[in-house]
Amino acid sequence: MSLQNHHNDIDKHVDDEVYNCLNLDNPKSFFLFAGAGSGKTRTLVNVLKEFKKNHGKQFRLNRKKIAIITYTNAASNEIKDRLEFDSIFSVSTIHSFAWELIEPFVQDIKSWLINNLAIDILKLEDEQSRSRDPKNKASIDRAKKIESKNKRRLNLNNIVKFIYNPNGDNTTKDSLNHSEVISIAAHFIQTKPLMQELVVCKFPILLIDESQDTKKELIDAFFELQKIKKDVFSLGLFGDTMQRIYFDGKEKLEKGLPDDWSKPVKKMNHRSNKRIITLINKIREHEDGQKQLPRTDKEDGFAKLFICSNRTEKSKTEKYICNEMANITDDSKWAKDGEEKDVMTLILEHHMAAKRMGFTDFFEPLYKEEKLKTGILDGTLSGSNFF
């Protein structure tokens, strides 16, 4: 289908296709390909509102919920608001959801930690034994880690209850860190039949937004759960693997899905102008062949590629590019400076953002601390929320 020969409501059938997967008598799992600007969240909300209208009373009586996992608190809050905070929908970030699953199982968490700490210590001790200089920084750091992990292992007997804050830094002796919560949840889902029963009983439908960025080990666990419980459980993934931001997500998520999964596709991009969509399609042409369509009422727009040496002075280069774009587009807003500047810049990486925005001295020390690293990268570090 060409960029011109289509209607703006070409994806209208997708909502029905997704809704049909949530059949409680014959559940079906699915991966919804939804590229940039496709209206993914709108489809999610429309489908859930229709489900609520038809099955909400039944779910409330049976104390069941649909779990909707998002990547950020902002996305979670938006979906909750659009679903009118209805109790049959459990909307949370992946860390909050994982913690809800594992929190009651204190002894099982202890067993996992004992085993995991032992493996870590053995690995560190092996590396330490092969160190040529026990006084260099790497050796000193390893020695500190070995001591810390041994202390933690011994302290496990004194812990009555573990604590965890999905939006905090979790540094107390009885706390779990973000990575551990995800790994423990994945392990329990894959290996413990009781956990599998609890998940599908409470959440017979589990939907994951931005699934391409959900940690690989947890996605693999959900795949295993769906394989075992597919007669009573529907797993729905929303996403676009080309929009993957974090490297710990599952690569090529849409490849190798079971034959009995539904694979609906949203073709429209309601957000971008036509030239931009043409460029997007060209970029991904040899990757997965997915093509998006623009709205018929969108302008052509402009898409220009400037290739510069990494040795150039960035501020001068960007100023030059803005002036060039002002001439190309006949739009003076490109060339404005200071408070009148009206150009949006996409910064792809945390270190780059820190350098450009002038907070390197704040970012670097926190990034170097392993226990704070995850929080500073995903915005959950409690102290950073002050800013």
Where are each of the predicted segments found?
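The feature marks helicase ATPase cores and/or their adjacent C-terminal helical subdomains
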Residues: 1-387
